[in-house]
């Protein structure tokens, strides 16, 4: 039985009855929710315990906006981390029992072990010469180093500039720009040419094909009235980014047409130059790259796209099934070229490309509805765009391979205008 003195001493303690807060063992002393046990010196829930373990030793919050007098919301929600940490400390939570650096992984030890490992790694050809293991060949000596093959294409740039300035070779009058481009495509393909089978592809053949491709694109674009209204600088810049996309699509379209008409065999690729209709077996042609690299094709196999031939075959088969008309093919060329140029140059070029694509899309709609009497054409356009997507994806993959080859200094080829040959 308690004595009166002990009872009176208890009532006269420093804490008044109004300031005493009694907590149940089942209630978190911080937020008032259901507790999980005693953590770091106080009865708390798991959320408050985790918060204190995470923030108890850091205390790197933004300062409280209410001078540490925030009101706590119901259901355990806190809007202010400093005030929540202060309440944790007020109820007796302490960092004395925190355990630091108990993980078996130590960054300092790992760094020392890594340095020791590198010191013990023996020199290989790759580490000694500074070249990748992807090319299994030692670096040549200074006497064996071959100077870069410099190719001046200024004459070609001047020819392309003159073509753009002079305009179309044949004046045409058509209902809209898309049909004019289709007629321009027929004019560029022109007369029948002598067939020629290419069995070897070297420097002269490669540069000749590039030159013919760029000239064809420049002549074809002169039949695009909206394009001709741009400044000469803008036309020249866009041509540099469009010619490879156009030539890739034109080559596959000609190959599909040649196979359908049985002009070439089913495993051949066909295109045309100014004077000849050329054909080649991709897997049988002899390729000479000694003029641009000191490595052989076998050594450069990693930098080649091994699946390119198979993907080209899929595109050719799709074109043989769809048999696009010249109007559809012209739209495909414009869409692929403008989309790529806009994505490459951005800014003003992107705005121009989007405006041209919208105009040509309206012309294609008129062509289907009024000329072809085909109001339900969405599925056909979708199949045509699948072909364009395949070609654009191949070009982007080729760009990655080209950049990788440039990093490893695989080719000793240098152009006077390198921006023209980024997408080879």
From Swiss-Prot:
MF terms from GO for this chain are: DNA-binding transcription factor activity; RNA polymerase II cis-regulatory region sequence-specific DNA binding; zinc ion binding
Q: InterPro entries under this entry?
A: C.elegans_Orphan_NR (IPR051152), HNF4-like_DBD (IPR049636), NHR-like_dom_sf (IPR035500), Nucl_hrmn_rcpt_lig-bd (IPR000536), Znf_hrmn_rcpt (IPR001628), Znf_NHR/GATA (IPR013088)
Offer one Pfam family short name for this entry. Hormone_recep
Q: SMART domains attached here? A: HOLI (SM00430), ZnF_C4 (SM00399)
- List every stretch annotated Disordered: 1-20
Signal sequence span per UniProt?
none
Q: DNA-binding residues per UniProt?
A: 25-100
Cross-referenced Gene3D superfamilies, in alphabetical order? Erythroid Transcription Factor GATA-1, subunit A (3.30.50.10), Retinoid X Receptor (1.10.565.10)
Instruction: From the Swiss-Prot or TrEMBL record, give the protein name.
Output: Nuclear hormone receptor family member nhr-55
User: What is the originating organism of this protein?
Assistant: Caenorhabditis elegans
Quote the gene name from the UniProt entry: nhr-55
């Amino acid at each position: 039985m308690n004595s009166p003195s002990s009872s009176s001493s208890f009532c006269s303690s420093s804490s008044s009855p109004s300031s005493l807060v009694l907590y149940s063992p089942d209630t978190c002393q911080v937020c008032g929710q259901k507790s999980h046990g005693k953590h770091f010196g106080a009865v708390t829930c798991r959320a408050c315990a985790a918060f204190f373990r995470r923030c108890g030793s850091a205390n790197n919050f933004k300062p409280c906006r209410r001078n540490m007098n925030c009101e706590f919301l119901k259901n355990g929600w806190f809007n202010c981390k400093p005030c929540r940490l202060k309440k944790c400390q007020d109820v007796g939570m302490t960092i004395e029992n925190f355990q630091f650096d108990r993980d078996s992984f130590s960054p300092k030890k790992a760094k020392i072990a890594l340095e020791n490992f590198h010191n013990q790694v023996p020199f290989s050809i790759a580490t000694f010469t500074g070249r990748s293991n992807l090319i299994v060949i030692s670096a040549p000596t200074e006497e064996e180093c071959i100077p870069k093959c410099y190719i001046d294409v200024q004459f070609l740039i001047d020819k392309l500039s003159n073509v753009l300035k002079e305009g179309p070779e044949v004046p045409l009058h058509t209902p809209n720009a898309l049909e004019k481009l289709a007629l321009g495509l027929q004019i560029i393909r022109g007369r029948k040419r002598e067939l020629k089978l290419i069995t070897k592809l070297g420097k002269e053949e490669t540069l000749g094909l590039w030159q013919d491709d760029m000239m064809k694109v420049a002549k074809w674009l002169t039949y695009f009235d909206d394009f001709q209204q741009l400044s000469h600088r803008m036309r020249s810049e866009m041509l540099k980014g469009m010619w490879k996309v156009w030539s890739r699509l034109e080559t596959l379209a000609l190959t599909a047409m040649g196979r359908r008409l049985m002009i070439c065999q089913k495993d051949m690729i066909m295109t045309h130059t100014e004077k000849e209709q050329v054909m080649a077996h991709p897997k049988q042609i002899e390729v000479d790259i000694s003029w641009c690299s000191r490595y052989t094709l076998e050594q450069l196999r990693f930098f080649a796209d091994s699946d390119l031939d198979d993907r080209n075959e899929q595109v050719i088969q799709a074109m043989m099934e769809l048999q696009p008309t010249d109007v559809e093919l012209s739209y495909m060329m414009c869409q692929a070229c403008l989309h790529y140029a806009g994505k490459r140059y951005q800014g003003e070029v992107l705005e121009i490309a989007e405006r041209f694509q919208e105009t040509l899309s309206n012309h294609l709609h008129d062509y289907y509805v009024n000329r072809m009497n085909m109001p339900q054409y969405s599925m056909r356009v979708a199949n045509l765009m699948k072909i364009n997507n395949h070609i654009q994806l191949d070009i982007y993959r080729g760009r990655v391979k080209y950049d990788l080859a440039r990093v490893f200094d695989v080719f000793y080829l240098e152009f006077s205008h390198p921006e023209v040959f980024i997408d080879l």
